Amino acid sequence: VCVLNVNARDLNILFKDIIDPLLELKNINIGLGTGDNKYEKHDEIFDNDIEVVINYILKNKNFISNNSTLFIGGNSQSKLDLVQKYNLGINQWMGSDSDFIDKHNIYNNLINPRGTLSRCVTNKNIYVFDYEKIFVVKDSNLKIFQETIDNIFKND
């Protein structure tokens, strides 16, 4: 799994240096988000169109032939609309259990989605529906890396 903030760099650099090499990999699960300064501070935030990135990936021959998947992260209605428009997977990084159940309901109505329903977890909530659990091993913010690992593996 690789999650990318589409606004962290210039669009051409994003395609050439990040996305194109990732699309060479087989069975890569790519996540896209637009980022904000809520969890990680950025010196510069670009205003890239996430739909341009989605279309670039979905039309890429390697994405198709390598059996890769694509999901969107975020809780906004605009992100959920993109999931439905492009038939993508959904990930929840932060947010409430009720937000995740709402995402499950949206995902459940997709026909042959191009990604999975997933949640980055630090707790042991059990749901009766199937979803991919993503354990965060490294956060891009190195300052909180150790704290994140401690929170993932602590016994509540």
Locations of regions flagged by a protein language model:
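Active-site-adjacent structural elements that line small-molecule/cofactor binding pockets in enzymes
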Residues: V1-D156
